[in-house]
Curated annotation (Swiss-Prot):
This is 2-isopropylmalate synthase. It is found in: Cytoplasm. It comes from the Bacteria. It comes from Synechococcus sp. (strain CC9605). Homodimer. Its EC number is 2.3.3.13. One of its GO terms (biological process) is L-leucine biosynthetic process. NCBIfam families: leuA_bact, PRK00915.1-3. The gene is leuA. Pfam families: HCS_D2, HMGL-like, LeuA_dimer.
Length: 540
């Protein structure tokens, strides 16, 4: 059997695989804020990014290693393809963390070997020990992944895994890269690895899976029953295509059904010892932070963290819950950090009160950021009687979300009505502080604002999504606007909140434009899609 740490290790890849969601790109400060909250949540490993992809990705992983990694903190991990350049960049990026890991991978399925890598099985069997051994010479903790393991020939998979462990891999990850397998198949795959890889006892078995068929969480839970002891997942299940296995669903399934899973860990059924180290009361806070910073809205009926997860509409259900919550609720909402209690702030609230509440919500702002957030808070408090947690989250998300500003919105004015043609006048500041003003007409005030901004910026793009939601209840609620722009096949999101949704739309559009410009300059590699040259392999 594989090495058993006695519980399930939670490997969070929100900052790497989760960020690959279309339009979910994060800047350095956003990544740092999420990493700090993941540490509070109690995850075991944070995969902070793909350091070789770009200088920005390298800097983000390095900064997280410096500020979040610690002797008692999470392991800080970076992803690297099976190449010396990737692995060396990864080692350098995670070096500041006392507990660090290199996660390297290569595909093992025939379809990937033939069409993506153009390599033979023999080539892969030569590359794996060489690259794992090189990674192990740089760090003590090396994870190796067999990309597309779910569609790989099991016998070949066993050979590759055995070679990786012999070369020094301490964790073996089995990805269902395209979300193809069913729970019984995935469980059998893990069981087969335990049975047929002679040295599997020297490594922890990890699993990684995508949700293309909606089976990722079910697959993982079946894998746990068959010996997997590390689960690679993301907050809110975000990720490429249909997303990844959801951290909150996995953790709460193991928490609520602990008596069922305990025997698979050799425990008594009634053992009260948690199966993960996650602090479940931090789940809701973490979910909201990730949603706010990525702009990926959580669907209302999403398990555990959706707005309706603890709501009851049916009269029969409401009656039952009022008499005894256990009639229709298997989870106490407070267990995941959802509470009806709230501290309302207003225009008389001071800086210390705002700072304290932000810290409780998971935001650790610098003095400069706090000053700006407090100024924004006071401005909002003049227009809105009561400032709620969701208002604060919107303010700070907007604050820390700002990419390096190529453009800055100074003025928005609109005229519209039933007998008027919607017209907008906007003023933009460029990075040198020069002002330009322009006007445009549109089908509505928001369309007019976006057209005017586009004309001034001169950055070709296609607006593919505009959405607005109310941050809180009431007629004075802030409107949270998300705008997504597309250019050269890449998506860029902008978000902003204001009590005036037209102003918020202008701010969100400029935010998206700044991200687009920064993204064009960044030109990141994609770990699974970009080619790699292996310097030491003459046949490649």
């Amino acid at each position: 059997m594989a090495k058993d740490p006695g519980r399930v290790l939670i490997f969070d890849t929100t900052l790497r695989d989760g960020e690959q969601s279309p339009g979910a790109s994060l800047n350095l400060e956003e990544k740092l804020a999420i990493a700090q909250q993941l540490a509070r949540l109690g995850v075991d490993v944070i995969e902070a990014g793909f350091p070789f992809a770009s200088p920005g990705d390298f800097a983000a992983v390095q900064r997280i290693a410096q500020q979040v990694g610690g002797d008692n903190g999470p392991i800080i991990c970076g992803l690297a393809r099976a190449s010396r350049a990737d692995i060396k960049a990864c080692a350098d990026a995670v070096a500041p963390a006392p507990r660090r890991r290199i996660h390297t991978f290569i595909a093992t399925s025939d379809i990937h070997l033939e069409h993506k890598l153009r390599k033979s099985r023999g080539d892969v069997l030569g590359i794996v020990p060489e690259m794992v051994s090189y990674a192990r010479s740089l760090v003590e903790d090396v994870e190796f992944s067999c990309e597309d393991a779910g569609r790989s020939d099991p016998e070949f998979l066993y050979e590759v895994i055995e070679a990786a462990i012999a070369a020094g891999a301490t964790t073996i990850n089995i990805p269902d890269t395209v979300g193809y397998t069913t729970p019984s198949e995935f469980g059998a795959l893990i069981a087969g690895i335990n049975q047929h890889v002679p040295n599997i006892g020297e490594a922890v078995i990890s699993v990684h899976g995508h949700n293309d068929l909606g089976l990722a969480v079910a697959n993982f839970l079946e894998a746990v029953k068959n010996g997997a002891r590390q689960l690679e997942c993301t907050i809110n299940g975000i990720g490429e295509r249909a997303g990844n296995a959801s951290l909150e669903e996995l953790v709460m399934a193991l928490h609520v059904r602990r008596r069922y899973y305990n025997p698979f860990f050799g425990r008594e059924e009634d053992s009260p010892t948690p199966l993960t180290a996650v602090r479940t009361e931090e789940i809701t806070k973490t979910s909201r932070l990730v949603s706010n910073l990525t702009g990926m809205v959580v669907q209302p009926n999403k398990a555990i963290v959706g707005a309706n997860a603890f709501a009851h509409e049916s009269g029969i259900h409401q009656d039952g819950v009022l008499k005894n919550r256990l009639t229709y609720e298997i989870i106490d909402a407070q267990t995941v950090g959802l509470s009806d209690n709230r501290i309302s702030l207003g225009k008389l609230s001071g800086r210390s009160a705002v700072r304290a509440r932000l810290e409780e919500l998971g935001y650790d702002l610098t003095r400069e950021d706090l000053d700006e957030a407090f100024a924004r808070f006071k401005e909002l408090a003049d227009r809105k009687r009561e400032i709620t947690d969701r208002d604060l989250e919107a303010i700070v998300s907007e604050q820390v979300q700002q990419p390096e500003a190529r453009f800055q919105l100074k003025l928005v004015q609109v005229s519209c009505g039933s007998s008027l043609r919607p017209t907008a006048t906007v003023t933009l500041l460029d990075e040198e502080g020069s002002e330009t003003t322009g006007s445009a007409v549109g089908t509505g005030p928001v369309d007019a604002v976006c057209r005017a901004l586009n004309d001034l910026a001169g950055v070709p793009n296609e607006l593919i999504e505009f959405s607005v939601k109310s941050v809180t209840e009431g007629i004075d609620a802030m409107g949270d606007v998300t705008i997504r722009l597309r250019r050269n096949g890449a998506l860029y999101s902008g978000h902003a909140a204001d009590t005036d949704v037209v102003v918020a739309a202008g701010m969100a559009f400029v935010n998206a434009l700044n991200r687009l410009v920064a993204g064009e300059e960044r030109q990141s590699l994609h770990p699974q899609k970009d080619p790699v040259v292996l310097e030491s392999r003459p046949t490649l």
